[in-house]
Amino acid sequence: VEFAKKHWNDEMHYFVGAGNQWGATYSYAMCYWEEQLWLKTKSITSNEFFHGMFEIVTKETPVTIYIGEDAQRPLSERVANFIPRICENYTIIDSKDYELKGISEKYRKHLSHHVMHAVNNRIDVHMEIETRHPMEIRRYYRRLEY
């Protein structure tokens, strides 16, 4: 709820992720926020963050960082550890923060992208409310030939 209230009207929002979180990062920015909510975004991999993007981040820039539990976790942790030095408008969503009752620790890395997908879906419910824009409405998709 808080995330949606804070970000529903962002002029631009940056999503950062790596490893098995890259799918959630990319698709959430492009398919959900751009296509379905009509909000401007950019998705970037954690390993590319320090090759340009961090130069455009300011104190107010909206940035969401996804952290998974696979071998690429250190890349996203590096971004998460750095971002507070330059930005006050960031969110870190770490799959480790969500309990997976009955799932062994050694398997979490294989499931963490599903956790992120569930988190994104919960955010979407609140984004629809805040934007007053049902996500099934499109301007062009399946409305015009292209």
Regions found by a protein language model. Give the residues of each.
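A SIS-like phosphosugar-recognition module
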Residues: 1-146
